[in-house]
Amino acid sequence: MSIKAEEISTLIKQQIQNYQSEIEVHDVGTVIQVGDGIARVHGLDNCMAGELVEFSNGVLGMAQNLEESNVGIVILGPYRDIREGDEVKRTGRIMEVPVGEELIGRIVNPLGQPVDGLGPILTSKTRPIESQAPGVMDRKSVHEPLQTGIKAIDALIPIGRGQRELIIGDRQTGKTSVAIDTILNQKDQDMICVYVAIGQKESTVRGVVETLRKHGALDYTIVVTASASQPAPLLYLAPYAGVTMGEEFMYNGKHVLVVYDDLSKQAAAYRELSLLLRRPPGREAFPGDVFYLHSRLLERAAKLSDAKGAGSITALPFVETQAGDISAYIPTNVISITDGQIFLQSDLFFSGVRPAINAGLSVSRVGGSAQIKAMKKVAGTLRLDLASYRELEAFAQFGSDLDQATQAKLNRGARTVEVLKQDLNKPLPVEKQVAILYALTKGYLDDIPVADIRRFEEEYYMYLDQNHKDLLDGIAKTGNLPADEDFKAAIEGFKRTFAPSN
């Protein structure tokens, strides 16, 4: 077989004509120091703040400190395999998470990767986790109610869609229970919920997920978890990942509830990172920008104007106090950022008042304008009744001979406390809340023994469901109270059938 020179030259010419010079340019640096989840890298001169970088073993990192001679990078994963001298590559991307309908019902980590064993999440949409909060002109004042299903909150400390309401209290006072009940009550309310667990035990997160699944709430909930065993950078990123997933729905005109459980652990993780990055410490060893850490997160909760689609994000951040001290650094910071706080007290919790809400220290700064008219009317005097009861209760312990007016206030107060108690995972529709509070404030419960109040309440709801469904439907549809004589007839009709225990 002879080889022809022309064929060879033709082939070479074709190769030369089709040759495409593809040069990939990577900005790379070298690890000069690594430890405790932090790497110092030399050579990434053009690196952006917050940019993702990739280590040679495939683990991602996030640029935090841009210094003259090196870059301080927090490592978003296992760092044991990273060695001094390893190559680090810029990605040119800011930290992003996947977003969209596909995440609903899933449990993900702060990078948006599924951790529930149900396979990959098939979404091509992503959003950067750090984004600008809506401006003044893009917002609208809070005016729609967000019903939590908890009598004490919906009556005394109402929350509106787009509000930021802090839930604050010691450990084991029922903070998570308040949030879970609120999520359960959003069923059929056209709300999407995002539950962000920061630094929780994995067993606790599993318990929350099972509660949501049992009540059918996972159908509209995304769970973002960075458990206590995860590295500090993931705990720091978790709340931003959660609100980013919520923003996708808000900007599409939907209503979202985001629960951050809890921001104290995020602040502690950020303190750890900052100290390892050698940033100067301030009060309680927190860095100087710990206020900005929380303010830029919570400012992203908003009620958007009609021009922007009228969506909303309601934020329920948690802060854990030590021995009820709400004047510590992180609690005062978050109180000053939010639109009110719900203070849960351990003394009340252990004395059997659950939810253990301290009505005197709790406040909702903007929720009043979102409350339905019926609730406003029946709950108007409730806070004062409760405050004067707590005051008189202290005096009543010293002497037994009280005048009639004082005794009447004490009796009403004891019944008010009893009515505001509620069982776990049993949120109550707003119309039923109005019905029992109407009976309480109009004095229909004054002759019922305190021990029978809870039983009275349950049987009263059953009676209304069977005989006066129109009254409940009227409150639910119009938001107004029915005529006094109709309500009076219903309550008196039930009282005739109710048998007190003594």
UniProtKB/Swiss-Prot annotation:
GO cellular component: plasma membrane; proton-transporting ATP synthase complex
Example GO molecular function: proton-transporting ATP synthase activity, rotational mechanism
Major localization class: membrane
Topology relative to the membrane: Peripheral membrane protein
Reaction(s) catalysed by this chain's protein: ATP + H2O + 4 H(+)(in) = ADP + phosphate + 5 H(+)(out)
Binding positions (ATP): 169-176
UniProt-listed Enzyme Commission number(s): 7.1.2.2
Subcellular location: Cell membrane
Domain of life: Bacteria
Matches recorded under PROSITE patterns: ATPASE_ALPHA_BETA
CDD domains: ATP-synt_F1_alpha_C, ATP-synt_F1_alpha_N, F1-ATPase_alpha_CD
Disulfide bonds: none
Keyword field: ATP synthesis, ATP-binding, Cell membrane, CF(1), Hydrogen ion transport, Ion transport, Membrane, Nucleotide-binding, Translocase, Transport
Pfam family, one: ATP-synt_ab_C
InterPro entries named among the record's database cross-references: ATP_synth_asu-like_sf, ATP_synth_asu_C, ATP_synth_asu_C_sf, ATP_synth_F1_a_nt-bd_dom, ATP_synth_F1_asu, ATPase_a/bsu_AS, ATPase_F1/V1/A1_a/bsu_N, ATPase_F1/V1/A1_a/bsu_N_sf
Record note on quaternary structure: F-type ATPases have 2 components, CF(1) - the catalytic core - and CF(0) - the membrane proton channel. CF(1) has five subunits: alpha(3), beta(3), gamma(1), delta(1), epsilon(1). CF(0) has three main subunits: a(1), b(2) and c(9-12). The alpha and beta chains form an alternating ring which encloses part of the gamma chain. CF(1) is attached to CF(0) by a central stalk formed by the gamma and epsilon chains, while a peripheral stalk is formed by the delta and b chains.
Matches recorded under PANTHER family: ATP SYNTHASE SUBUNIT ALPHA, MITOCHONDRIAL (PTHR48082:SF2)
Family the UniProt entry places it in: Belongs to the ATPase alpha/beta chains family.
Role, per record: Produces ATP from ADP in the presence of a proton gradient across the membrane. The alpha chain is a regulatory subunit.
UniProt name for this protein: ATP synthase subunit alpha
